[in-house]
Regions:
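Active-site anion-handling motifs in enzyme catalytic cores
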Residues: 1-338
Length: 338
């Protein structure tokens, strides 16, 4: 009997670190599941924020197919973004295959295009990034909305009530949103993360213990100062919660994606790149859903004010259907690289 050796699939920028970010956990779960049902299993991954060249060079260079989860890393020439592109170059230099998927691409150095010009599959999560990457590489680049929205969620309830207020990558926005949550009994403060502080996989030993103690102290203080706040354990709990709300107010792209996936109306405060604005443009939603922290203080946030229009709902449903189909094609094509 002839044995068939499976190709070695390696992922870099694995953003599911202990389930901390619910949307990130969902993206990585979708990547794993979609590869698995096509007979491809991930043999190893490099966590977000880690330089693969430090301790994972052997793993990355053993890949037959390297999957780079671009996420929000590839903007403004970030050092961590360059690490991902250098991984692509290393694997392509060995004659193996690389797929860069689910990527933001914004305001990057001119030479970055050279680093991915030979990558087998290029796929961005917003049309602005597609245009920028096409200009940088001269290549065809696919567009699929964030992978967190590419697979169906549990059935959405027919009735909704209450307002969920989230957090932001910016501490001042998180603080302002927490203050906003005290303005009404209808408001509940629920971040889209399992805890207040992220524990980087870079931290080990004494540094990790100290960071853990600090994070625990900060979270206890946050909960004491914000009686309406609670942290959920996982993605399923968050999806169940947000799908029952009449409005989500957030400063995170993560929470906007999950609001759209569950057809929950939202208002968003601008983040650290164009990702939320681009998502609103791509779907065709009311641009007034995007606001600044200053304007949010004067915004009518009453239930029903931000319900989706018939056109918005139709646009969401059309995009989710298209992205589901396009994601299936994407993973079929990744499997075909084997």
């Amino acid at each position: 009997m002839i044995s068939v050796t499976k190709p070695r699939i390696v992922v870099v920028n694995d953003t599911d670190v202990n389930g901390y970010h619910f949307r990130c956990a969902r993206v990585m779960s979708i990547i794993r599941n979609q590869l698995s049902i096509r007979g491809l299993d991930i043999v190893g991954s490099v966590a977000v924020s880690l330089n693969w060249q430090d301790a994972n060079a052997k793993l990355v260079n053993s890949a037959d197919i390297l999957v780079i989860n671009g996420e929000g890393t590839l903007h403004h020439g970030s050092r961590k973004g360059r690490w991902l592109l250098e991984a692509a170059q290393s694997v392509k230099g060995r004659g193996r295959s690389v797929a860069l998927i689910n990527a933001l691409w914004q305001n990057n150095p001119a030479d970055w295009g050279d680093l991915i010009r030979d990558v087998d599959i290029l796929c961005c999560r917003d049309s602005r990034s597609v245009s920028a990457m096409v200009e940088a590489t001269g290549r065809d680049v696919r567009f699929i909305g964030d992978l967190s929205m590419s697979q169906p969620v549990p059935q959405v309830p027919s009735t909704r009530s209450g307002v969920v207020i989230g957090d932001s990558v910016h501490a001042n926005v998180t603080a302002a949103l927490a203050k906003l949550a005290t303005k009404s009994n209808e408001f509940e403060l629920v971040p889209v993360t399992s805890s207040l502080k992220f524990l980087s996989p870079n931290l080990t030993g004494l540094r990790r213990k100290l960071r853990t103690a600090y994070a625990t102290m900060k979270q206890k203080r946050f909960l004491a100062q914000n009686p309406s706040a609670r942290f959920l354990a996982n993605e399923d709990e968050y999806l169940s919660m947000v799908s029952k709300k009449s409005l989500s107010i957030t400063g995170r792209f993560h929470a906007v994606c999950l609001a759209i996936a569950t057809q929950t109306p939202f208002v968003a405060v601008t983040s650290n790149s164009w990702k939320i604005e681009a998502l609103i443009e791509d779907i065709g939603l009311n641009t007034e859903r995007m606001t600044t922290l200053t304007d949010l203080a004067n915004t009518d946030l009453s239930e029903g004010r931000w319900d989706y229009s018939a056109d918005e709902l139709a646009n969401i449903e059309a995009c989710l259907t298209d992205w589901h189909s396009a994601a299936n094609t994407l993973f079929d094509d990744i499997a075909a690289l084997a």
